[in-house]
């Protein structure tokens, strides 16, 4: 599943010049104006200081400000990837697709695969592969859940308090960390560390799959809405997955599962699995 993005970036850059009528001499890596923008300078300084949540906020604002400029968005993608701000890179690739008219046809042969591999990136791949093997999970399922939960944003946080790439509630994560001995002490901020979040989230997803006897729909519903709710829905529907999906009383959870199925199918198509 590993992809050499730097190699794919070269033809993507040439395509960008043609698609947006840019001079062939255009510098695709650097812009004095962009890299001296106060927001860019703040983001880089926050990143240097390890204040990743603040850096992420600044990068997101900078991307929004430049969302009509395909060239600067392309330049920012490289910065985001180099610095590990994968959510911003993913969002930037969507902007390129929109500006170039490929938002609805991202798999077109005329559209550079560079952007598709960024939007559906196999980020944190060594950790995902290790977690998948440890907990007998599908690598693509883990990628799909992370995509749906956070778009690979390490600093992602929900209004309900869920945090990190797999959007774990601190109480749930602490329980798993304590039971498994994975962390000797647990702080909610540990969930902002992708490796910790992935380990705890994979453990929880594997637990849900065990409880619901390998039923993906039921396990995903439990991951999103809690196992208690899922058990009450099963009591009404039995084992038919389609009936179960339509009986889920929370629209958010129904949409959640359908989104993950679609994301999973796209990952399967892109990576040939």
Model-derived regions: residue spans:
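Alpha-helical segment of the N-proximal tetratricopeptide repeat
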Residues: 29-61
């Amino acid at each position: 599943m590993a992809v050499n993005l730097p190699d794919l970036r070269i033809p993507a850059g040439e395509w960008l010049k043609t698609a947006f009528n840019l001079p062939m001499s255009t510098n695709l890596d650097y812009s004095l104006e962009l890299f001296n923008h106060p927001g860019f300078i703040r983001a880089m300084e926050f990143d240097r200081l390890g204040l990743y949540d603040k850096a992420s906020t600044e990068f997101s604002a900078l991307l929004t400000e430049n969302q009509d400029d395909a060239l600067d968005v392309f330049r920012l993608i490289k910065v985001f990837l180099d610095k590990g701000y994968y959510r911003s890179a993913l969002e930037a690739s969507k902007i390129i697709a929109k500006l170039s008219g490929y938002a609805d046809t991202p798999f077109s042969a005329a559209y550079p695969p560079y952007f598709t591999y960024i939007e559906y990136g196999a980020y944190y791949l060594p950790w995902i592969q290790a977690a998948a093997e440890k907990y007998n999970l599908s690598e693509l399922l883990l990628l799909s859940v992370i995509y749906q939960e956070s778009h690979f944003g390490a600093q992602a946080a929900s209004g309900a308090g869920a945090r990190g790439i797999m959007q774990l509630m601190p109480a749930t994560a602490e329980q798993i960390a304590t039971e498994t001995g994975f962390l000797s002490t647990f702080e909610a901020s540990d969930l902002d560390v992708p490796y910790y979040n992935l380990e705890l989230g994979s453990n929880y997803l594997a637990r849900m799959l065990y409880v619901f006897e390998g039923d993906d729909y039921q396990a995903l519903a439990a991951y999103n809405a809690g196992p208690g709710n899922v058990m009450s829905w099963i009591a009404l529907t039995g084992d038919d997955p389609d009936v179960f999906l339509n009986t889920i009383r929370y629209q958010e959870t129904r949409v959640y599962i359908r989104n993950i199925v679609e994301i999973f199918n796209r990952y399967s198509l892109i990576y040939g699995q």
